[in-house]
């Protein structure tokens, strides 16, 4: 049986630099206001990950995220809110424990806007980013080429455009999430009606 050291010694030195024993790898968790959810998640939402918070309309997804931001701020974490729904309410956020003077806020109307803002926030060292909600983001197919001008509706019918753009978005965001100082990204999404029989 080959040992770890023997296996690593057989590898190319460039690859060997990136490998090692799987010890000392720890995940930090951000507690939520829900003890039950924290227990189910092993301590809360994990840093260094992308979390999808999905549910029906008005099921307190945004409120849970705002309360989680408030808890993170009390731990000294820098937080951001990317608003695609245009539904952020400063007064409500403050009632839920958010220090809004220390919360970075940005609007995002398209998937491209969201990626640009989120990647910039990750590079700036923001600890926790909430995107509310990915269901409201327009895919690139809705815009004229290299423009923010919307196309006519009849030229936007491309099956899977939103899914395709979001897939690429999450790949870029995952790559930008620095594992030396991992951030937590929470994306909110809404359940849609099933239109099939």
In which residue ranges do the predicted regions lie?
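P-loop NTPase motor core
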Residues: 63, 108-197
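The Walker A/P-loop phosphate-binding site
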Residues: 2-106, 114-123
């Amino acid at each position: 049986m080959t040992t770890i050291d023997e296996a690593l010694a057989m590898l190319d030195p460039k690859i060997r630099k990136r490998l090692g024993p799987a010890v000392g790898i720890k995940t930090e968790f951000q507690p939520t206001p829900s003890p039950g959810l924290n227990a189910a998640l092993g301590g809360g939402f994990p840093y260094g990950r992308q979390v999808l918070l999905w549910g029906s309309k008005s099921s307190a997804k945004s409120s849970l995220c705002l309360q989680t931001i408030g808890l993170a701020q009390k731990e000294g974490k820098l937080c951001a809110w990317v608003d695609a729904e245009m539904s952020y309410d400063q007064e409500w956020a403050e009632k839920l424990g958010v220090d809004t003077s220390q919360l970075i806020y940005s609007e995002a109307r398209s998937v491209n806007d969201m990626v640009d803002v989120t990647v910039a926030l990750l590079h700036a060292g923001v600890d926790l980013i909430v995107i509310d909600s990915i269901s409201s983001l327009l895919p690139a197919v809705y815009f004229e080429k290299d423009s923010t001008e919307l196309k006519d509706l009849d030229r936007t019918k491309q099956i899977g455009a939103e899914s395709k753009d979001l897939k690429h978005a999450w790949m870029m965001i995952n790559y930008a999430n620095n594992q030396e100082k991992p951030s937590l990204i929470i994306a909110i999404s809404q359940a849609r009606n099933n239109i099939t029989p």
